[in-house]
Each structure stands twice: as structure tokens, then as C-alpha cells.
Amino acid sequence: MLALAGRIVTFEPDRPDLADGVLYVGDGKIVGVSKRTEKPPSEFADVKPIEVDGVLYPGLIDLHSHILYNLRTLWAPGGRTEPYTSHNQWPDADTYSQEITAPARVWSKSPAAREVLAYAEAKAIAGGTTAIQGAPGTSKPYEGFLVRNVDNETFGTGEDKVSQSALTLVLDELKKRAQKMRDGDTFVYHLAEGTGPKLLDEFHDVDDAHCLSERLVAIHCTALG
């Protein structure tokens, strides 16, 4: 059980924001919201609220995004009319490197990288998202930005417990990720993206590496259907 104290934005027209409120969470669900001066739910009588020193917003959780790419308009490969059947295909498009890969690489390594990422996160907030997955791979400390970054979540330990890969990993690397999951990490993996039959091999590799667990967050998986 968890109790969070701070300014609470309700987004309910018949219920004003709470300047000093407490939000109660149990079993992964919001149990109640009230003023700090009000009596808590009975099961939270001995739970001390955690001071967030900020504002608590309701919001969407986006578990699949590419934040830096969100700076650009939607990319479309010129001249192609047939849909792709595998995530291994579109990187070979003539304009992909110039219009997608190169700009993202420049943005992530520029002196203004933090500002660039903040702008992309502001776009997410405008759409109602308050937690997002898909932060660029970097050693720079982005945690604590406008939107909660799932990839960089430390859960208060100071240690990154979430790893991710948008690229297909070989079996030996998957086995390393499986060991990290057994040690308590979470692994976000782009898996079997497309409809081509060969993509099923990616799922078999994940299975053979013993990565199928509750700590695997598998994205796409369209070839499994």
C-alpha cells in the first residue's frame, strides 16, 4: 500500500483540485483521494504519506514510443505502396537514414539534447501522457523531466532497473537479459514486429533464452497472431 501527498489535480468539473491532498494506492489501484485533514481509508491508518513536493496528475501511460522521433512529422517512404511485413525492411528505405536516423543521432548528442527531449515530452503532455517509454539510449541523466521516463526509472534506488532494446538481439545477449530479469530487472523488447513468418524465430529465441517471464514487456508481437 502507498499514500502520496501533494497538490492533486482531479480533472473533474464537480470536484476541485486539492491543494494539500493524499492519494491512496493499493493492489495497483487508486483506493481513494482526499484532503490531508480527512480520515484515510481504514486500511491506510498506519501508512505514512510520502511527500512528493509537487503535483499529482492523472494521465496516460505510453508504453511504446520513440521520443526523439516525435519531433518530426510522420515519416512516409516515398514511392512505396505496399505495406512492410517486417521491421527489418524500412531501415533500408532510401530516405530512412537521412530523415530519421541521422537527425535523431544529431539531436541526442547535441548540447541542447535536454531541451530537445523536453520539447518532445511537452508534446506528450499535451496529449495527456504523463509516463512514457522510448527515451533515447544515452548516458546523460534525463530522469526527472516533464514526463516520467519508464526506461530510466530507478524506483528511488539510484540504480537503473529497466533495460530496453528496439533492435533484435542474438540468443547469447537474450540470455544475459534473462539473468538480469531473474535479478529483478525489467526488460522492454521490440519483438516479432510485422507479419512475416521468419519473425516467429525472434519469439523462439526469447523462449530458448528463458526470457518469457512477468518482467518481460514485449512490444508489437504482431507475428504471433
Task: Label each residue range with its predicted role.
Residues 9, 66-68, 137-138, 192:
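Catalytic metal-binding/acid-base residues of hydrolase active sites
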Residues 6, 23, 28, 53, ...:
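Divalent metal-coordination and catalytic microenvironments
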Residues 1-45, 54:
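N-terminal metal-binding scaffold of metallo-dependent hydrolase/deaminase domains
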Residues 34, 65, 71, 133-137:
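Glycine-rich, histidine-containing beta strand-loop boundary motifs that form or position
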Residues 2, 59-61, 187:
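Residue-level marker for buried hydrophobic side chains located in beta-strands
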Residues 54-122:
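Metal-associated gating/positioning segment near the N- to mid-region
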Residues 128-217, 223:
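Metal-coordinating catalytic core of metallo-dependent amide/deamination hydrolases
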Residues 35, 71-74, 145-146:
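Short, solvent-exposed loop/turn and secondary-structure capping segments
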